[in-house]
Design a protein with these regions (language model features):
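N-terminal Rossmann-like FAD-binding beta1-loop-alpha1 element of flavoenzymes
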Residues: 126-152
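Dinucleotide-binding Rossmann-like beta1-alpha1 core, especially the glycine-rich loop
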Residues: 169-251
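Conserved Rossmann-like nucleotide-cofactor binding loop
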Residues: 61, 135, 158
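SAM cofactor-binding core of SAM-dependent methyltransferases
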Residues: 4-66
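Helical element adjacent to the flavin cofactor pocket in flavoenzyme catalytic cores
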Residues: 259-286
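Extreme N-terminal leader/targeting segments of oxidoreductases
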Residues: 94-97, 103-126
Length: 286
């Protein structure tokens, strides 16, 4: 059970933060401390500051691939950055400045890499973003959500004029032998993409099934590469919720087997860009 005094102290730091409150939790476990922090007392409004909760979970209760995972909770004005695996293997990703720490005793092993001091104050700042495609509009939205004024520039007359103007695009994680940094980054990006699209849909800016969807994605593999690909998949030991091997004809009338991503999907890039820019609100200048 989380310590009530610690939860109260961390919640106070969140309530008094002006822009972003960053919290480190070295022992996420089942997420009790995180849930307790979000479970505000009756009558207490959601804090205006964004809560960025960075946590380590060596033994997740549900199957999760190792590495960094991201969960956006706009209804709580919070983000969860969860590292699955031994925390010391992720020090490069976890090091930084934190406004508060859960489980201070357990966090001492990270004290060399963590600076427990308030992060940058939330004074109004202005940032220029170059490019008005998926990447640029997503960066702009992330900055605006932190209360930062954004000036968006693009060489074209309007947004989504380049590759982001394609009619449709597919998205799924990238799998490689040895689980390269690119693969780990793609998993994080994939999770972030799905959550970003879901958040925009909840705001009424996108419609699932019309602007995007996640019906699953089958990446076929040539017969001469099938055995090696299956061996790679077995070595990585990812949960089937992320990826599994599909035999020829199992999912589609094809003679090729392949990698099946059950949450893989498609999106209309231009609609995604438009939704991002609309969600930025008054903090965006184009």
């Amino acid at each position: 059970m989380p310590c009530p005094e610690t939860v109260h102290a961390v919640r106070s730091a969140w309530l008094t933060s002006a822009g972003v409150c960053t919290v480190f939790d070295p022992e996420f476990g089942s997420g009790e401390s995180f849930n307790a922090l979000l479970n505000l007392p009756d009558g207490m409004p959601t804090p205006k500051a964004l809560l960025r909760y960075v946590a380590v979970c060596e033994h997740p209760q549900t199957p999760l691939a190792p590495g960094l995972h991201f969960l956006n909770l706009p209804q709580h004005n919070a983000e969860l950055h969860l590292y699955v695996g031994a925390g010391k293997s992720a020090l490069a990703e976890l090091q930084g400045k934190y406004d508060a720490v859960m489980e201070p005793d357990a966090a001492r092993q990270y004290s060399r890499w963590l600076k427990r001091e308030p992060s940058a104050s939330g004074k109004l700042r202005s940032v220029a973003v170059l490019g008005a495609g998926i990447a640029g509009s997503s960066v702009a939205l992330a900055l605006c959500r932190q209360g930062i004024q954004v000036h968006l520039f693009d060489q074209a007359a309007g947004p989504a004029a380049g590759a982001s103007g394609n009619w449709v695009g597919a998205f799924h994680p990238h799998i490689t032998r040895g689980d390269s940094p690119l693969s780990r980054l793609s998993r994080l990006g994939f999770e972030h993409t799905v959550q970003a699209l879901e958040a925009l849909s909840r705001q009424g800016l996108l419609e699932k099934g019309v602007d995007w969807d996640t019906p699953g994605h089958l990446q076929t593999v040539p017969p001469e590469e099938a055995m090696r690909t299956r061996e790679t998949l077995q070595q990585l030991d990812f949960p089937p919720e992320l990826v599994s091997w599909a035999e020829p004809g199992e999912l589609l009338p094809t003679h090729l087997g392949g990698l099946y991503f059950p949450k893989g999907g498609w999106v209309k890039p231009a609609r995604w860009v438009q939704a991002n820019l609309h969600a930025c609100g008054e903090l965006l200048n184009t």
